[in-house]
Regions:
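Membrane-proximal helix-turn-helix segments that form the acceptor-binding/catalytic region
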Residues: 79-82, 105, 129-147
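Short alpha-helical donor nucleotide-sugar binding micro-motif in glycosyltransferases
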Residues: 254-255, 262-267
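A conserved mid-protein helix/loop that constitutes part of the nucleotide-sugar donor-binding site
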Residues: 15, 193, 197, 202-216
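Nucleotide-activated donor-binding/catalytic signature segment of Leloir-type glycosyltransferases, i.e.
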Residues: 236-258
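Short hydrophobic beta-strand element within catalytic cores of glycosyltransferases
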Residues: 292-295
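Conserved acidic donor-binding segment of nucleotide-sugar-dependent glycosyltransferases
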Residues: 310-318, 326-332
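Glycosyltransferase donor-sugar binding loop
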Residues: 37-39, 173, 198, 222-237, ...
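Aromatic "clamp/platform" in nucleotide-sugar-dependent glycosyltransferases that forms part
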Residues: 275
C-alpha cells in the first residue's frame, strides 16, 4: 500500500491504512506499506520502526518541501511496488493515484481508494497541486482495476463525471474503552465540562467557524481544539488569533494514546464543523466513545450520523452558535444522543466487514 504518510494518527488515510493492514496480516496475508521518509507529528519513537504488527514498512525517498513530499514519495512508492513481488497494489487518495499507471504497466492488480475529492481542499484549489490531483483522479479511472469510495456522494460523482462504477466501502471503527479524566486535568478538563474538536488543523475542517460561534455563547464549558499542524501552520496561527481573549479555549496540539482516549471519553459534545470531508473517521471515533455529536450538514457527515446527532448548516456561524447554546442548555437532549451513539456507529461501520469486502476486490478477476 502507498499514499499514507506513515502508520500513524496523522490523518484519516493513515488510520485507515493501519486498520486494514493489521487485519489483512492477521488473515495470513503479506502486507508492505511504502511510507514517506522523515519525521512526523506522532513522535520520534515511530520514526525508526521497520515493522508494525507484522506489517512490513519501507521508507521511500521523499523531498521534504511543501507540495513535493506527496508527489515524490508517491512516485518512488509506485516505482518500488511496480518492481516488487506483489500481487496487488492498493493506492490511497487521488494525488498518489497519479502514479497508478506504474504498477499497472508492470502487470500488477491496482486498487485505488478515493478518500475524498482532494482538489476541493483549500490548499489544492489552484496551481500545480490542483492539476496534479485532478490528473490523479483521471488516472485512477483509467488504470485502476477497482476503485473504492467512502461516500455515496463521491460514488455518484464518479458515475456522473466518468461513467465509472465504483465500490462503496466506508471506513470502520473499533469499540473503545471509555476512560476517566486524569491526564487532561492539566488543561482544567473534567467529565462533561468541554466541547471537543479533534482532527487535522486545516481550513476545510471549519475550526474557525467553531471558534467564532463558541466565543458568542454563554457557558462555563471550555472548547478544546486538539490536533497537529503539518503544512498548515499559518491556519493554526489564525485560529489562535481568533481565540485570543477567551481563556475558555484550549489548544492541545497533536494527541494520541491515553490523552486521545480521555478527550473522547469525557467530552460533553464532539463538534465537526467541516466544509469538506471524504469520510470523517474522527466522527466515527467520537460516536464510538458515546459522544453527542454536532456536525455540519454536508452529505458525508449526515450519511454517517443519520438521526443520532445534532446537525447545523454548513459554514453558518450563527446556526452553529444557536445549536451550541441549545445543547449547553439542554443536557437531557445531549444525554439521549450519547446513550445511542456507540452501539449505533459500531454496528454500522465494522472494520472486519470492511476488510473482508476489500479482500474480495483483491481477488476479483
Amino acid at each position: 500500500m502507498f499514499g499514507q504518510k506513515r502508520l500513524s494518527r496523522e490523518g484519516g488515510v493513515e488510520i485507515v491504512v493501519k486498520e486494514l493492514c493489521i487485519r489483512m496480516v492477521k488473515q495470513g496475508n503479506n502486507v508492505t506499506c511504502f511510507n514517506r521518509s522523515g519525521h512526523h507529528v506522532s513522535g520520534n519513537e515511530f520514526d525508526a520502526h521497520n515493522e508494525y504488527d507484522g506489517i512490513v514498512q519501507k521508507s521511500v525517498l521523499t523531498i521534504d518541501k511543501k507540495g513535493l513530499a506527496a508527489v515524490s514519495s508517491s512516485f518512488f512508492a509506485g516505482l518500488k511496488s511496480a518492481f516488487g513481488n506483489y500481487d496487488v497494489v492498493h493506492i490511497h487518495a487521488e494525488g498518489p493515484a497519479f502514479f497508478s499507471w506504474l504498477p499497472k504497466f508492470f502487470g500488477k492488480k491496482v486498487i485505488v481508494t478515493i478518500h475524498g475529492l482532494d482538489w476541493q481542499r483549500e490548499k489544492w484549489k489552484s496551481g500545480f497541486g490542483s492539476k496534479f490531483i485532478h490528473q490523479g483522479e483521471k488516472n485512477a479511472v483509467k488504470y485502476a482495476d477497482e476503485i473504492i469510495v467512502l461516500s455515496k456522494g463521491v460514488q455518484d460523482y464518479f458515475k456522473n463525471e466518468y461513467n465509472r462504477d465504483t465500490h462503496f466501502i466506508p471506513n470502520g471503527v473499533n469499540k473503545p474503552e471509555v476512560v476517566e479524566a486524569q491526564q487532561i486535568k492539566k488543561w482544567g478538563l473534567e467529565k462533561d465540562n468541554y466541547i471537543l474538536y479533534l482532527g487535522r488543523i486545516v481550513p476545510e475542517k471549519g475550526e474557525h467557524y467553531l471558534i467564532k460561534a463558541f466565543k458568542q455563547i454563554q457557558t462555563n464549558k471550555k472548547l478544546v481544539i486538539a490536533g497537529g499542524v503539518s503544512d498548515t501552520a499559518e491556519y493554526g496561527n489564525k485560529l489562535k488569533e481568533l481565540a485570543a481573549g477567551d481563556d475558555r479555549i484550549v489548544f492541545t496540539g497533536f494527541v494520541q494514546g491515553r490523552l486521545l482516549d480521555e478527550l473522547y471519553s469525557n467530552a460533553y459534545i464532539y463538534c465537526l464543523p467541516s466544509d469538506l470531508e471524504g469520510m470523517p473517521l474522527s466522527l466515527l471515533e467520537a460516536m464510538s466513545y458515546g459522544n453527542c455529536c454536532l456536525v455540519s450538514d454536508i452529505p458525508e457527515c449526515a450519511e454517517v450520523v443519520e438521526d443520532k446527532a445534532i446537525i447545523f448548516k454548513k459554514s453558518n456561524v450563527e446556526d452553529l452558535k444557536d445549536k451550541l447554546q441549545d445543547a449547553c442548555e439542554h443536557s437531557e437532549t445531549v444525554h439521549e444522543l450519547k446513550i445511542q451513539a456507540s452501539d449505533f456507529i459500531c454496528a454500522k461501520y465494522n472494520w472486519d466487514d470492511i476488510v473482508n469486502k476489500t479482500m474480495k476486490l483483491y481477488g476479483r478477476n
